[in-house]
């Protein structure tokens, strides 16, 4: 089979050849939440038995692991931080309810 060559004519201004520069950005496929904001909130306002502070420490470790590229480690630290945040929130709300009930009974 003979190869056909086609010519394309562009109307308008003359064509100036320039070299094109390509930039590639490697983006991570999965974004792992590190729960830093939630941990900071729990540290400042709902720090039941220092659970908020420990959750903040695990959140920072998760963020560090994510920056290094260790997604498995980041997910493990983020999961621990999430559990600690939920525990801190639950126990702080439970303590507040108990205090309100005890004060209301007196």
UniProtKB/Swiss-Prot annotation:
It comes from the Eukaryota. Predominantly expressed in nascent primordial germ cells, as well as in gonadal germ cells. InterPro entries: CD225/Dispanin_fam, IFITM_antiviral_protein. Palmitoylation on membrane-proximal cysteines controls clustering in membrane compartments and antiviral activity. A lipid is attached at residues 49-50, 83 (S-palmitoyl cysteine). It is a single-pass membrane protein. Residues 1-35, 57-84 are cytoplasmic. The keyword Coiled coil does not apply. The chain crosses the membrane at residues 85-105. One of its GO terms (biological process) is positive regulation of osteoblast differentiation. Residues 36-56 dip into the membrane without crossing it. Residues 106 are extracellular. Pfam families: CD225. Its main location: membrane. It is found in: Cell membrane; Lysosome membrane. One of its GO terms (cellular component) is protein-containing complex. IFN-induced antiviral protein which inhibits the entry of viruses to the host cell cytoplasm, permitting endocytosis, but preventing subsequent viral fusion and release of viral contents into the cytosol. Active against multiple viruses, including influenza A virus, SARS coronavirus (SARS-CoV), Marburg virus (MARV), Ebola virus (EBOV), Dengue virus (DNV) and West Nile virus (WNV). Can inhibit: influenza virus hemagglutinin protein-mediated viral entry, MARV and EBOV GP1,2-mediated viral entry and SARS-CoV S protein-mediated viral entry. Interacts with CD81. Part of a complex composed of CD19, CR2/CD21, CD81 and IFITM1/CD225 in the membrane of mature B-cells. Interacts with CAV1; this interaction enhances the ability of CAV1 in inhibiting ERK activation. Belongs to the CD225/Dispanin family. This is Interferon-induced transmembrane protein 1. It comes from Mus musculus. The gene is Ifitm1.
